[in-house]
């Protein structure tokens, strides 16, 4: 019935070198151009190159940044060239040939009629061998019922040995002297006659369209298809766009600028990035003393903490182009695409320098080399190698700063994290109470709030929430207010939205009175321990209304953020988790499946106390388990062997069992002492289904739990080690 859930390459593309003047090379230079002409052309090229250098130098003096163009012969300058005209024509001719073959295959040639004499035609009519005719002017075209053998007169004169051809479809011309009896003669011999006026002859334009229309349609379709694929990139990019970067460019002039005013609650991370903005705005301030800007800044934090928003704010404050791309978008099925896209991304950034490149989820391509591929370099490793090359100090990249975000920094390759690539690491933590209130103010700028809606109280009620969580909370509250046809968002809307997010939505479930009573005692056990244990988190709400996967909920939250926990607090938390099972055993003398999640979480907490935090007298101060936080330093690899012996494993199990057993007995002892209050609370829950903090205190007659250091500790508490709302979520009840 419940659980105490903590809310908490192929090689690089070929480079084709062409002379500056394609027709002047080798023999052509000997025979087609004089020495004077060659010298003039060389002088022109030198002058043109000098002009280009002067233009680049002037650009550097104005902006303080090196030119984005690369020197002749450098790898960057040969990253991507336009398709030569000859190649474009080659593809065009190839498409025409394919089109012609397809038309020949799809539209087979019709049988061509054979010109026969008029007398032969009349003779076959007399024999009844003409099936049908079609007349247009003086020309008659028709079909014989049975094919005949016919050899034209010119063929007879040329070579009489040629065999006669079988004729089925024929054409003939009516003599200028009209045969007046032809029509009756045809009808009497059962010939089907068709005719068309001469003035309905097809126009020349119609003939052209009829002849070339299908081919033109095929060509237009291929052109559209190739352009579409080139725009989409990836496999769809085909020949023209396979190596193009998929980065999205955000220019601050094209939309609403994101600034640090839109970022709240993460002041420490924001302060780390202010210097980056200052460098982009005023480079000489730092370069005059020999300083250089960090080439890369790695943003580390849990999902939803605002890493992407911080990167956009840096670009907005500096007023430079912002190129954003997910690391997963670099790699495709075709080998070498990832490295090509990395080169293209940095090339675009150089062309628009100063600029910011933002790579989200860097761990998708930045994992340590050698962990994924077996027996050779993988596509991911080639992409990583190209990123390392682009960020290396050997290439001039002044004015380009790379920002990257990840929630798994420990899996990144060490070469990626060394100074000279990602020089700085900025940790974006979850906001504290003050930070959450500031974030709520940002997200409620356009939301009309009622007078009873206190953002401070809401911030206190949402410990452990990230910026994305708070934004979702405000949106859910606004939607609830709209469904209720209100003109503003009230405190009730925020509370209901919070319960929906943390506890899950209410679900209709028809329960018997016996099931309701058992659930009420289960939740009552959690609530009573939350009231009598010293230092326990406040019990804000208890309900037996099914929510999400839970049949009932006990909702607790701390009064302030907590960052350090004593052993007594953790032991008290385990006692609180086992309060539901203890209440069932005391009242009914039986067990149900409802405490499954409670037991799972209590066991996990006890295991961490023994293996990670050194809270076992038997095992002492030894860490026997890797860190479990996947965001700020998880295990270095997967499937690694445990770092202890079988005997130590048995000792760990014994200590965990001891802690759980002692906590279970303590929970039952306390509930027996407060059995009267437990019965009253369960009865009220069956009747009202949901009780808030004041109603619980009034019904039980108990005061809120005293502070952890106030007097003797009968049981520390049932609070939450992560300072998030402690929620008791019962599982599915067993058979009654």
UniProtKB/Swiss-Prot annotation:
GO terms for cellular component: plasma membrane. One of its GO terms (biological process) is protein catabolic process. The chain crosses the membrane at residues 88-108, 206-226. Residues 1-87, 227-736 are cytoplasmic. It is an enzyme of class 3 (hydrolase). CDD domains: RecA-like_FtsH (cd19501). It is a multi-pass membrane protein. The active site is at residue 523. Keywords: ATP-binding, Cell inner membrane, Cell membrane, Hydrolase, Membrane, Metal-binding, Metalloprotease, Nucleotide-binding, Protease, Transmembrane, Transmembrane helix, Zinc. Residues 109-205 are periplasmic. Residues 57-73 have a biased composition (Polar residues). The keyword Protease applies. Its main location: membrane. Homohexamer. This is ATP-dependent zinc metalloprotease FtsH. The gene is ftsH.
